[in-house]
Amino acid sequence: MPTINQLVRKPRQSKIKKSDSPALNKGFNSKKKKFTDLNSPQKRGVCTRVGTMTPKKPNSALRKYARVRLSNNIEINAYIPGIGHNLQEHSVVLVRGGRVKDLPGVRYHIVRGALDTSGVDGRRQGRSLYGTKKPKN
């Protein structure tokens, strides 16, 4: 335990929290070719590769993911949620934070129903996460 005098001389340091989605916390000044501090909830990007990945040990599947070049020129891997998708190379997508626990290196999600990404067809419950419009009937 430090004494009061020690705490007066050197107060306690608060812990610095590391961001879970660092690519969303940078902007890019293309004129000066420098990164800027610009926190944003989502970013726009262009798909450079769309493919599947196998998850870590206890699970087994083919998870869909896309390699995305963001508007700040950072390349990331983003998960494509839901059943079926219409993404291909050069599709423009909106990316949000949020990792996929069983896919190493995937720390972002693609927002369904925004920009070039379609919503999930035939979805009736939990539609807002998958960009599906309310059915007419």
UniProtKB/Swiss-Prot annotation:
GO terms for cellular component: ribosome; small ribosomal subunit. GO terms for molecular function: rRNA binding; structural constituent of ribosome; tRNA binding. Disulfide bonds: none annotated. PROSITE patterns: RIBOSOMAL_S12 (PS00055). InterPro entries: NA-bd_OB-fold (IPR012340), Ribosomal_uS12 (IPR006032), Ribosomal_uS12_bac (IPR005679). Signal peptide: none annotated. Keywords: Methylation, Ribonucleoprotein, Ribosomal protein, RNA-binding, rRNA-binding, tRNA-binding. The keyword Metal-binding does not apply. Part of the 30S ribosomal subunit. Contacts proteins S8 and S17. May interact with IF1 in the 30S initiation complex. This is Small ribosomal subunit protein uS12.
